[in-house]
């Protein structure tokens, strides 16, 4: 479990190549087996302070599960084309938008969410990453798309409607 996380944080210590081999062989039978080797998103290693205890450590021990949300209708995986926005409002961020093809969101506790927080001087999206609890008001986890080639794999649609999360 958490085989991609460093051993000093309680993970399995596998490097990217070894993890790829594990997932490749599990995937020959069924993507459902990949649940056995559930792995936290590597970006969680950037957590600091209270976020380590709230998100990173419980995800490594299996107490909490995460998913990652970047893909959007109309933009696919083109992050610069994403429409999901996060806007500062006092001591909160307010998030609005839709993500789709989100693996296993229905069994996750929180999402590693990428959203646009403004534009640069050339009009390109500035992106930020947020940790959002999926039981948070303003978050809807909906059934995604049936995938013929992915036995045991479930993807979801995430809708964010005036979802408020505190500035940290």
What do the PLM-derived regions correspond to, one by one?
Residues 62-70, 114:
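A short, Trp-centered hydrophobic/proline-enriched beta-strand micro-motif
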Residues 81-83, 135-167:
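Flexible, small-/acidic-enriched active-site or ligand-binding loops
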Residues 75-78, 88, 93:
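Hydrophobic, small-residue-rich alpha-helical packing segments that form membrane-like cores
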Residues 59, 74-77, 101-104, 120-121, ...:
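Short Gly/Pro-enriched turn/cap motifs at secondary-structure boundaries
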Residues 22-26, 115, 132-137, 161-165:
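Short Ser/Thr-interspersed hydrophobic loop/turn segments at strand-loop and sheet-helix junctions
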């Amino acid at each position: 479990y958490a085989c991609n996380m460093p051993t000093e944080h309680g993970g399995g210590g596998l490097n990217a190549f070894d993890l790829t081999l594990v997932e490749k062989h599990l995937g020959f039978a069924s993507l459902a087996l990949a649940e056995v080797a559930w792995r936290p998103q590597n970006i969680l290693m950037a957590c600091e302070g209270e976020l380590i205890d709230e998100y990173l450590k419980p995800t490594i021990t299996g107490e909490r599960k995460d998913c990652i949300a970047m893909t959007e209708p109309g933009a696919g995986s083109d992050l610069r084309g994403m429409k999901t926005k996060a806007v500062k409002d006092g001591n909160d961020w307010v998030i609005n938008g839709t993500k789709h093809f989100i693996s296993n969101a229905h069994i996750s506790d929180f999402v590693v969410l990428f959203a646009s927080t403004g534009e640069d001087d050339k009009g390109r999206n500035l992106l930020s990453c947020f940790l959002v609890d999926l039981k948070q008001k303003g978050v809807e986890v909906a059934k995604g798309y049936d995938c013929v080639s992915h036995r045991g794999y479930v993807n979801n649609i995430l809708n964010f409607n005036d979802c408020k999360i505190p500035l940290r």
